[in-house]
Amino acid sequence: MKKPAYIGRFAPTPSGYLHFGSLVAALASYLDARAVGGQWLLRMEDLDPPREVAGAQVAILETLERYGFEWDGEMVRQSERHDAYADILQRWFNHGLAYACTCSRKQLEAFEGVYPGFCRDAGHAAENAAIRIRVPELEYRFEDRVQGTFHMHLGRESGDFVIRRRDGLYAYQLAVVIDDAWQGVTDIVRGADLLDSTPRHLYLQELLGLPQPRYLHVPLITQPDGHKLGKSYRSPPLPADQATPLLLRALRALGQPVDAHMADGTAQEVLAWGIRHWNASLIPRQRTIEEARIA
């Protein structure tokens, strides 16, 4: 069987319920895949049990179904993929590409997110320590389909970053690269808050000899104070009975044409309309959009 030319995915985190910002990201990834006859996969990024909200996974699936989304194949849970992460991490550790770090947050807070390398050559044991990957003094760049050229010098702007936390939980940066490759994802459509993570992903892809996916980062939906919508700021979950109007609003947030007659349609009809008329070049070329400004 021939592999699809386009494999996309939506990968929510069950630290809360889906909100309008989640819907915009899900819709963009869904329409971008379906408009070219591609696959759309669903992955639950449940890497952090202490932050997971009870019942959120079930609620996320139910919401996606009520809003008309249909995914291909079985949903993947990252909590069931730990062996794959451990194998690669151990390989890098054995070859000196990764190392143990015992630095506390307090020690690092003055460095504004750029790791200064305190533990780089300390030779700490891996137990009760975070694991960091060594980064080169190189700039990584990519062409985003909406945001344009993006680049980051990993040494100066990131430093060696964590791939496994001190508590033993695997970091998003590691898991997302491994799982996207394992699932054959060719196109990653997600929020612009993850632009800064992408150069790190390019580096890990390089280490693993993986092909680079195409990237499209959609504007992040924010509150008036500039914070993104999310559980931390008590963003309301998507109501079960508002699928059609909220899907239409999400289309407008993505700059897509909306037919007035669609207001009387079902969620499935709105999605079908969106697929037929999808044009990624109409997505606003900006990092954020304030929710209150969306009609």
From Swiss-Prot:
Keyword terms of this UniProt record: Aminoacyl-tRNA synthetase, ATP-binding, Ligase, Metal-binding, Nucleotide-binding, Zinc
Required co-factors: Zn(2+)
Motif ('KMSKS' region): 228-232
Positions bound to Zn(2+): C101, C103, Y115, C119
The protein's name in its UniProt record: Glutamyl-Q tRNA(Asp) synthetase
Motif ('HIGH' region): 12-22
Pfam entry (one): tRNA-synt_1c
Superkingdom assignment: Bacteria
